[in-house]
């Protein structure tokens, strides 16, 4: 009897979790700006996904940011890999190439992050909060203040955040909210200094010949970039005790 009860409880917990996730989008529509975005963009999104043979709503999304190109790529789940849905330009930008290491340094972070929260009443229209500082950032900034409150948002104004056009953040926000409602609890946001093709990466390293720590950091990011480029599957990464990003398993 006890195994049966345990199994039933497990089923109830799974059902409750799925119901809560599915309610997420409905709750978001209770906010004026999200409702406006939904009313103006949902039919277009549905049509575009259908024309491209993509499932709607998306079961998962993945964001890649390239600072030098001012580019935000949004990928969506397609079968067992990811398909590029759209490439957005970001219009508000501060700092230079390289990671964020201190409060007030104006830098847009670089590394492997996740969306931690949705802000439907942002001062910048709509925003997605990132988990900066992550484990790697905290190790590299021990004894200092790494800063925080890093978002992807609208209004084309930025001090260390990723800012896009208002209609673009509406679309990104809706698709991320759809994926969250479909059960994706961790929405990855990978931020690179530039598109790390072999040619561009070699040129990037030539700019930091006397900065081996920065060159090593960018080499870690390239490993994650290359892993995704091989099969369009989001790589699994971990942070080791020294703060280095490591690929898990056979992705190397």
Name every feature range the model reports, one short phrase each:
Residues 1-4:
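Positively charged n-region of N-terminal signal peptides that target proteins for export
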Residues 22-159, 167-187, 196-252:
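Cell wall/extracellular polymer interaction/catalysis modules
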Residues 192-193:
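Hydrophobic transmembrane alpha-helices
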